[in-house]
UniProtKB/Swiss-Prot annotation:
Pathway involvement of the protein, from the record: Protein modification; protein lipoylation via endogenous pathway; protein N(6)-(lipoyl)lysine from octanoyl-[acyl-carrier-protein]: step 2/2
The record's free-text note on cofactor binding: Binds 2 [4Fe-4S] clusters per subunit. One cluster is coordinated with 3 cysteines and an exchangeable S-adenosyl-L-methionine.
Name of the featured protein: Lipoyl synthase
Keywords on record: 4Fe-4S, Cytoplasm, Iron, Iron-sulfur, Metal-binding, S-adenosyl-L-methionine, Transferase
GO terms assigned for molecular function: 4 iron, 4 sulfur cluster binding; lipoate synthase activity; metal ion binding
UniProt-listed HAMAP family: Lipoyl_synth
UniProt family annotation: Belongs to the radical SAM superfamily. Lipoyl synthase family.
Gene it is expressed from: lipA
Cofactor: [4Fe-4S] cluster
The reaction(s) this protein catalyses: [[Fe-S] cluster scaffold protein carrying a second [4Fe-4S](2+) cluster] + N(6)-octanoyl-L-lysyl-[protein] + 2 oxidized [2Fe-2S]-[ferredoxin] + 2 S-adenosyl-L-methionine + 4 H(+) = [[Fe-S] cluster scaffold protein] + N(6)-[(R)-dihydrolipoyl]-L-lysyl-[protein] + 4 Fe(3+) + 2 hydrogen sulfide + 2 5'-deoxyadenosine + 2 L-methionine + 2 reduced [2Fe-2S]-[ferredoxin]
Binding site for [4Fe-4S] cluster 1: 35, 40, 46, 273
Domain Radical SAM core: 47-262
Annotated positions binding [4Fe-4S] cluster 2: 61, 65, 68
């Protein structure tokens, strides 16, 4: 089947020269970003603002999700100084909000949870004012691993459901209920924790299914939601079934807020970490005259 042509509202230019400085720093510190690995269409905008989502635990994923462009090979050993390097980058960039994520590492005993916790601790030690957001895998339902991450006290803990239950075959090795349980367990472990999830639209989901997932997330105590358009990385990946109009994204945002979410980012180019700083600002607005 021939791919659906992208509409005008999804024509976004990537300008490599605009983020040469950021890429130089990442290369110097031997760091990866999901912006690069997942071929994010927002890379020029975010790198131009000196914002990035750091990818820890290497560049290689142990799962074979049909929507994702992150490398799927034999994972390499962990970099011993990775957490310290991320903290150094946060300090040098003067970041007020940082997002940390990783590929899924089912080959590691704790799924990489200890590295997440170490990274948070390292960032806190050199840049205590920085808000730290984690976007974690499911750790195969290992709640001890999850507890190690929760105990590191991130400002936001994210885990993406990605799509509706009927389409979960695109998420190799994942389970819808397990992902929901992870978000609920995190809130049980730390009732005041801000939790977040993201969904891709255009995979073939029905509107009623989308609203049902929103209800499930709210029942799991998830207060933050991101909705964005799925874009197939190549012809080898799961094909786009529909390009959702910007007006519909806005309607979904209004619906989600009415249902009870604290903050929602919903637009074609929204990704989990896009405008990440907005979520906490909606809960803790700056004093009048600032921001």
């Amino acid at each position: 089947m021939d791919p659906i042509r992208k509409p005008a509202w999804l024509q976004k230019k990537i300008i490599p020269a605009a983020h040469a400085e950021m890429e130089g720093l990442l290369k110097e510190l031997r760091l990866n970003t999901v912006c690069q690995q997942a071929r994010c269409p927002n890379i020029t905008e975010c790198f131009g603002k000196r914002q990035a989502t750091f990818l820890i635990l290497g560049r290689i994923c142990t799962r074979l999700c049909s929507f994702c462009s992150v490398s799927k090979e034999t994972p390499l050993p962990l970099e011993p100084g990775e957490a310290a390097s991320v903290a150094e980058a946060v300090k040098r960039l003067g970041l007020s909000h940082v997002v940390i994520t990783s590929p899924t590492r089912d080959d590691l005993p704790d799924g990489g949870a200890s590295v997440y916790a170490e990274t948070v601790a390292r960032i806190r030690s050199v840049s205590p004012a920085t808000k730290v957001e984690l976007l974690i895998p499911d750790f195969r339902g290992d709640w001890a691993a999850l507890a190690a991450v929760v105990e590191s006290a991130p400002d936001i803990l994210g885990h993406n459901l990605e799509t509706v239950p009927r389409l979960y075959s695109i998420r190799s090795g994942a389970d819808y209920r397990r992902s929901l349980d992870l978000l609920a367990q995190a809130r049980r472990m730390a009732p005041g924790l801000n939790t977040k999830s993201g969904l891709m639209l255009g995979l073939g989901e029905e509107e009623a299914e989308l609203f049902a997932v929103m209800e499930d997330l709210l029942k799991a105590g998830c207060g933050y939601l991101s909705l964005g358009q799925y874009l197939a990385p190549s012809r080898m990946h799961h094909p786009v079934q529909r390009y959702v109009e910007p007006e519909l994204f806005e309607r979904y945002k209004e619906r989600a807020l009415t249902m009870g979410f604290e903050h929602v980012e919903s637009a074609p180019y929204v990704r989990s970490s896009y405008h990440a700083e907005n979520y906490l600002e909606s809960k803790f607005p700056p004093p009048e005259g600032e921001g």
